[in-house]
């Protein structure tokens, strides 16, 4: 066992504070690595503020983790000391259900996936995330970060990247397809870059035009304000695929009307309240309303390799751990373009 520095939440109302946590001893199949960078995901904030249920405090958030291997177990074959690696939203699953065997561990129907933080590991201890100096994870849930991807830019790909890559791949985004992205934030800006790299024609749908210049620079061919009622008339029946990256309650009927025959609107965010789904827009053009959650280990590795090949990198702002609480406030105020990444050097010393 080892003791490492970390930042933890102790309640829904208090700021995160520096503390120490214990990491398990490296087992035969484990990989230990020093964390160099950890992204801040809005899910971290939802969790520590108990908006998705009361967590098991203290909580060390962070499921966008990148670093360098320091030790491997005696049976490890995939990694060696010095390798550049990452960990995303989960660190284990049952490994026996059909979904796990298919490389869709995020949909595990056995134990359910074991979250990187605020979950219980196989040994009965709580999992703690990437706002820390080091971590120990089973090799089967560790990802290899390609040499051409900087570690700081790679970190957000382990949640924001795979959350958008998976539905783009599943619903066949590519040449000849028109993709719309609702929201240009942490998820949305990566979705635009990925869809463009896949060869799709990309449109951003945002409440206002204030990020229009960014959207076009990132790869969108068009940018529309959803606050303008004419937008929905103008774009009716235009898209093969729409990714909803925001957690706000939307008029689903209006957005479904933007889809072509057999088009799909994919929910990636988690609205606070249920949304009404009108039947007519679904029936009229055999449209689909569906959802997607992160991605399995094989697909996440595929995503990292794709991003390296196509030079897809999130737009990030690097911070130190003592700025985490201010960063949370800025995320809530939509004052980040487009992902905070914590440089954890001070937690490794």
Swiss-Prot record:
<feature type="binding site">
    <location>
        <position position="97"/>
    </location>
    <ligand>
        <name>Zn(2+) 2</name>
    </ligand>
</feature>
<feature type="binding site">
    <location>
        <position position="159"/>
    </location>
    <ligand>
        <name>Zn(2+) 1</name>
    </ligand>
</feature>
<dbReference type="InterPro" id="IPR047109">
    <property type="entry name" value="CAD-like"/>
</dbReference>
<keyword id="KW-0560">Oxidoreductase</keyword>
<dbReference type="InterPro" id="IPR036291">
    <property type="entry name" value="NAD(P)-bd_dom_sf"/>
</dbReference>
<keyword id="KW-0832">Ubl conjugation</keyword>
<keyword id="KW-0479">Metal-binding</keyword>
<feature type="binding site">
    <location>
        <position position="63"/>
    </location>
    <ligand>
        <name>Zn(2+) 1</name>
    </ligand>
</feature>
<dbReference type="InterPro" id="IPR011032">
    <property type="entry name" value="GroES-like_sf"/>
</dbReference>
<dbReference type="GO" id="GO:0008270">
    <property type="term" value="F:zinc ion binding"/>
</dbReference>
<protein>
    <recommendedName>
        <fullName>NADP-dependent alcohol dehydrogenase C 1</fullName>
        <ecNumber>1.1.1.2</ecNumber>
    </recommendedName>
</protein>
<comment type="function">
    <text>Prefers aldehydes over alcohols.</text>
</comment>
<dbReference type="InterPro" id="IPR020843">
    <property type="entry name" value="PKS_ER"/>
</dbReference>
<comment type="similarity">
    <text>Belongs to the zinc-containing alcohol dehydrogenase family.</text>
</comment>
<keyword id="KW-0521">NADP</keyword>
<feature type="binding site">
    <location>
        <position position="94"/>
    </location>
    <ligand>
        <name>Zn(2+) 2</name>
    </ligand>
</feature>
<dbReference type="InterPro" id="IPR013149">
    <property type="entry name" value="ADH-like_C"/>
</dbReference>
<dbReference type="InterPro" id="IPR013154">
    <property type="entry name" value="ADH-like_N"/>
</dbReference>
<feature type="binding site">
    <location>
        <position position="100"/>
    </location>
    <ligand>
        <name>Zn(2+) 2</name>
    </ligand>
</feature>
<dbReference type="Pfam" id="PF08240">
    <property type="entry name" value="ADH_N"/>
</dbReference>
<dbReference type="GO" id="GO:0008106">
    <property type="term" value="F:alcohol dehydrogenase (NADP+) activity"/>
</dbReference>
<keyword id="KW-0862">Zinc</keyword>
<dbReference type="Pfam" id="PF00107">
    <property type="entry name" value="ADH_zinc_N"/>
</dbReference>
<feature type="cross-link" description="Isoglutamyl lysine isopeptide (Lys-Gln) (interchain with Q-Cter in protein Pup)">
    <location>
        <position position="210"/>
    </location>
</feature>
<dbReference type="InterPro" id="IPR002328">
    <property type="entry name" value="ADH_Zn_CS"/>
</dbReference>
<keyword id="KW-1017">Isopeptide bond</keyword>
<feature type="binding site">
    <location>
        <position position="41"/>
    </location>
    <ligand>
        <name>Zn(2+) 1</name>
    </ligand>
</feature>
<feature type="binding site">
    <location>
        <position position="108"/>
    </location>
    <ligand>
        <name>Zn(2+) 2</name>
    </ligand>
</feature>
């Amino acid at each position: 066992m080892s003791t490492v520095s970390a930042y933890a939440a102790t309640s829904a109302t208090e700021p995160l504070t520096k503390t120490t946590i214990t990491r398990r001893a490296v087992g035969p199949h484990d990989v230990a690595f020093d964390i160099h960078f950890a992204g801040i995901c809005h899910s971290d904030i939802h969790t520590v503020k108990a908006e998705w249920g009361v967590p098991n405090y203290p909580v060390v958030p962070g499921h966008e983790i990148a670093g360098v291997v320091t030790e491997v177990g005696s049976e490890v074959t995939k990694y060696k000391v010095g390798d550049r690696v990452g960990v995303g939203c989960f660190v284990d699953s049952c490994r026996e259900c059909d979904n796990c065997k298919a490389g869709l561990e995020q949909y595990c129907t056995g134990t359910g996936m074991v979250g990187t933080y605020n979950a219980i590991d196989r040994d009965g201890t709580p999992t703690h995330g990437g706002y820390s100096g080091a971590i120990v994870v089973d090799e089967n849930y560790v990802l290899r970060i390609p040499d051409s991807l900087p570690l700081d830019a790679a970190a957000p790909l382990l949640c924001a990247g795979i959350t958008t890559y998976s539905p783009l791949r599943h619903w066949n985004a590519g040449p000849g397809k028109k993709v719309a992205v609702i929201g240009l934030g942490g998820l949305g800006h990566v979705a635009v870059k990925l869809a463009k790299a896949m060869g799709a024609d990309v449109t951003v749908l945002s409440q206002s035009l204030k990020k229009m210049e960014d959207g076009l620079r990132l790869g969108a061919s068009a940018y529309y304000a959803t606050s303008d009622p004419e937008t929905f008339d103008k774009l009716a029946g235009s898209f093969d695929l729409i990714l909803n990256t925001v957690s706000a309650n939307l008029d689903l009927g209006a957005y479904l009307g933007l889809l072509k025959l057999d088009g799909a609107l994919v929910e990636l965010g988690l609205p606070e309240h249920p949304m009404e789904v009108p039947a007519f827009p679904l029936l009229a053009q055999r449209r689909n309303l569906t959802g997607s959650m992160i991605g399995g280990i094989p697909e996440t590795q595929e995503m990292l390799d794709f991003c390296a090949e196509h030079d897809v990198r999130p737009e990030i702002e690097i911070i130190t751990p003592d700025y985490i609480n201010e960063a949370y406030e800025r995320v809530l105020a939509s004052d980040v373009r487009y992902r905070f990444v914590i440089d954890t050097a001070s937690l490794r010393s």
